[in-house]
């Protein structure tokens, strides 16, 4: 039995009209939240289609404490700690382990790791492996990963092993929206 609190009418927790054009995704998410069951989602789509916004709203409506890993900031912090003295390296590893073992985790903007090097890709591959192992051992977890990459790009950037792990536990949701910023774009010509 899941320890997660069941949410009555989770749809009311989302902003009015939000993601109504993605009813399959939203209905699936709402079912999982209502039941209190663990969930793992991989949201893919172009920049600005609402992946991060939906992820944060999903987690907020659970009422649980959660960790958000912004890929770019997390990797820079990790690099800075690893390039400092010995004790900071152990702090970095300990912090990383704590975050990967949280009950609710959002990894935002996977594939936006800068610098985009083999070392960065290896690092994030290992993070996905750590989370995969934790999910396998502790069924009562929730994870959301957002990315602008599609499945083929994830395989090319990280590995087929990472994609295989994601496919085992994650519901993959493809957002077909265009950027909301483009919808609001006004170009004035002189």
Regions found by a protein language model. Give the residues of each.
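Short glycine-rich substrate-engagement loop in P-loop NTPases that contacts/grips substrate
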Residues: 63-101
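Residue-level preference for the first positions of well-ordered beta-strands
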Residues: 38-42, 104, 142-144
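Short, well-ordered alpha-helix to beta-strand connector turns
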Residues: 101-103, 169-170
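A short, basic N-terminal segment
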Residues: 1-33, 169-173, 177, 181-190
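Walker A/P-loop nucleotide-binding motif
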Residues: 38-55
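P-loop NTPase Walker A phosphate-binding motif
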Residues: 53-64
């Amino acid at each position: 039995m899941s320890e997660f609190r069941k949410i009555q009418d989770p749809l009311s927790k989302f902003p009015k009209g939000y993601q109504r054009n993605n009813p399959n995704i939203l209905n699936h998410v709402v079912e999982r939240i209502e039941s209190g069951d663990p969930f793992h989602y991989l949201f893919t789509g172009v920049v600005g289609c609402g992946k991060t916004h939906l992820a944060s709203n999903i987690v907020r409506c659970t009422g649980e404490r959660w960790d958000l890993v912004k890929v770019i900031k997390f990797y820079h912090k990790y690099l800075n700690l690893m390039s400092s003295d010995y004790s900071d390296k152990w702090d970095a590893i300990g912090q990383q382990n704590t975050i990967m073992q949280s009950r609710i985790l959002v990894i935002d903007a996977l594939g936006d790791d800068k610098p985009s090097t083999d070392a960065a890709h290896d690092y994030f591959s290992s993070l996905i492996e750590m989370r995969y192992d934790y999910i396998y051992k502790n069924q009562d977890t929730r994870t959301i990963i957002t990315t602008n990459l599609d499945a083929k790009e994830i395989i090319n950037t990280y590995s087929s092993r990472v994609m295989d792990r994601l496919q085992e536990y994650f519901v993959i949701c493809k957002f077909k929206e265009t950027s909301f910023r483009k919808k609001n774009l006004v170009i004035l010509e002189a």
